Amino acid sequence: KGNQNSSDTTSRDTNATSHTYNLGHDFLLNNLISTNTALGYGDSDANDDTGDYENYDFSLRFNFAFPWAYISIGDSLSFIDYKKVDTSIDSGRLRSDFTNTIDLTITKALGDFFPSLDPNRSLFLNLYFERAISESNIRNYDYEADSFSFSVNRSFQIFK
């Protein structure tokens, strides 16, 4: 639950309870290439019924464990059907969205660049790019968005 401020009704009304179910399959082709596929279903119920929706998802991902870097390329398709008409936008049309999200992740050990800083190659640098294209039957909800991120991860073993 998000904002519980009684004076901000927009935030309170868009709070939602969601349940999602996914079925996935991972396939290791060889030591270099693996794939992931997934099917998903979700149901979200907001305090304000105009935010209630069901979504159906399909995703496909290819992973490449090259000796010089780990690269992962994915594509996800989401079909979102809203349950109630949002009268603030269009009083006669039930909203339905289609979103295609493509992403690319590149991971490289810091020790490959600076062996003295990370001799065990357990500190990883990650670059991530995502492009989302969403089309709706109500034009106000169409959008395209790009996202970039950079992160640093450290792996360690808790129990030996």
Residue ranges and their predicted role:
Residues K1-K160:
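Gram-negative and organellar
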